[in-house]
């Protein structure tokens, strides 16, 4: 049995059922062994695409994505995708191999760790056969717990070596990763932010990917109906509020003219499960008159060089929204926002031929890209 067989078995044991790959010297034997274990493969024509597909797989399945490219120039090609995965906190494991230990010279040799850490990802270098299975388990557990991608580098001559009489103990990271459970808000903080919500006259509620994962969409719609808020989403959460007639689609750079007007006029933005990135706030210019309430398991104060939120509720997205709804019911004479205001905005959105009024030339027989947003 070769060492790459053990590597493949250890990765298969982590619940991996699919791998996105572009093969080369540093990963071909490992990939072959993994395929023989009935792990299906999707092959890319560019290394960046392999990582991007693994990112999409992780987002759809909720499980860490697996990609593999060769060492050296194969790794340098994935830096854009790897950086994007770090910023989006997408759990991902990338197996890249490494230049051979015993070669006196190797044309594609580079110091890989600095490239990986420059992207914000973590690098695990496997150099000792007795630690192979444990380091692979650790890589998967770290990405599952932190959402930070982990890159595994292992010299390909070490991969091709005989395993010998060493014991093989393989354990799944999922058996050791603790369940995070739901995050419940502090009652005192709920009362404080509820008072803020009750006073809002032109509220806007924005749902992000965290709201999608927490199944907070229906609760957000109920809160919006209660306080007279219009509904928007970040681009990754597009469609979350499609059942509401008061949904103005996405916020940020792709926002419609009507959505932008709602944000500019709003006095309170309730951001649920979104990272409050610069794109969603038009670099902070989109809400000039609004206080921002962030409901998230990891509330953000500063984001990308600006103050992102003024008020915070640390909670699971659905639980936090439901807590505010319940607290609003206890406030006598709670003044909700202007339902007439949001009805007018919804009517304007429906009447618009396109989300924005900017001139845009569309060639004959070509789909207008605005129809995709």
Regions found by a protein language model. Name each.
Residues 138, 142-199, 347, 354-359:
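Conformationally flexible catalytic loops at phosphate/diphosphate-handling active centers
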């Amino acid at each position: 049995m070769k060492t790459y067989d053990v590597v493949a078995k250890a990765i298969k044991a982590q619940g991996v059922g699919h791998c996105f790959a572009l093969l080369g010297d540093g990963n071909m034997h490992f990939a072959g062994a993994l395929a023989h274990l009935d792990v299906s493969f999707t092959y890319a024509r560019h290394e960046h695409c392999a990582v991007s597909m693994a990112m999409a797989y992780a987002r759809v399945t909720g499980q860490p994505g697996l990609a593999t490219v060769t060492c050296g120039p194969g790794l340098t090609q994935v830096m854009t995708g790897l950086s994007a995965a770090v910023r989006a906190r997408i759990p991902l494991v990338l197996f890249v191999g490494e230049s051979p230990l015993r070669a006196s010279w190797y044309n594609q040799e580079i110091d890989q760790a600095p490239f990986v850490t420059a992207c914000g990802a973590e690098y695990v270098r496997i150099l000792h056969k007795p630690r192979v299975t444990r380091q692979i388990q650790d890589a998967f557990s770290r990405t599952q717990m932190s959402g930070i991608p982990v890159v595994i580098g292992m010299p390909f001559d070490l991969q091709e070596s005989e395993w010998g009489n060493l014991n093989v103990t393989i354990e799944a990271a999922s058996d050791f990763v603790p369940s995070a459970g739901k995050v419940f808000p502090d009652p005192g903080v709920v009362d404080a932010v509820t008072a803020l919500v009750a006073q809002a006259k032109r509220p806007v509620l924005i749902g992000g990917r965290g709201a999608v994962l927490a199944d907070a969409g229906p609760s957000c719609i109920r809160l919006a109906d209660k306080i007279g808020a219009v509904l928007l989403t970040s681009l990754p959460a597009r469609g979350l509020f499609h059942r509401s007639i008061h949904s103005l689609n996405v916020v940020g750079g792709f926002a419609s003219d009507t959505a932008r007007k709602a944000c500019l006029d709003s006095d309170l933005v309730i951001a649920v499960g979104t990272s409050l990135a610069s794109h969603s706030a038009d670099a902070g210019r989109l809400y000039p008159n609004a206080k921002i309430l962030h409901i998230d398991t990891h509330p953000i104060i500063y984001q990308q060089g600006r103050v992102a939120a003024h008020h915070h509720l640390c909670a699971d997205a659905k639980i936090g929204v439901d807590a505010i709804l319940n607290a609003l019911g206890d406030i006598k004479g709670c003044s909700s926002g202007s339902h007439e205001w949001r009805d007018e905005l919804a009517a304007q959105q429906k009447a618009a031929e396109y989300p924005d009024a900017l001139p845009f030339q569309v060639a004959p027989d070509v789909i207008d890209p605005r129809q995709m947003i």
